[in-house]
């Protein structure tokens, strides 16, 4: 009986942490796109220069688990633990065309994808609070119902 309740609580904690990781990951990638835009706009840096100038903490917040910096941004996205597939699709689309056009066009593309990802971030964050409450309540309630039915 106690094991069922502990299992429900553990699953509840795991589900809530997953929702939090998803929201934090999307926020970190928004910050990454802001930095990319800033470095292209202000300093005219290439994608390789931008990648090597990124803060390790930002990469960890994005879910990067590698020891060495990847060679390009697509490799970075491939090695990150991204919990939100819509955000991953936006990022893959952006980085697949990044660095293949003139500076002015790159800035426009950065703004476009940053706007898309920011809208998605607001959606994910607004849903996160409700999902955390739902998962915390539902998992514990189901384990309690199971205990009542079994005993």
What does each model-found stretch correspond to?
Residues 1-65:
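Juxtamembrane/interface alpha-helical elements of multi-pass membrane proteins
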Residues 2-11, 125-151:
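Bilayer-spanning, highly hydrophobic alpha-helical transmembrane segments
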Residues 22-25, 47, 69, 87, ...:
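Residue-level recognition of alpha-helical structural elements
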Residues 28, 35, 53, 90, ...:
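Charged, amphipathic alpha-helical oligomerization/scaffolding segments
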Residues 37, 58, 62-63, 95, ...:
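A structural signal for well-ordered alpha-helices, especially hydrophobic packing surfaces
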Residues 100-141:
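Membrane-interface, cytosolic juxtamembrane amphipathic helix immediately N-terminal to a transmembrane helix
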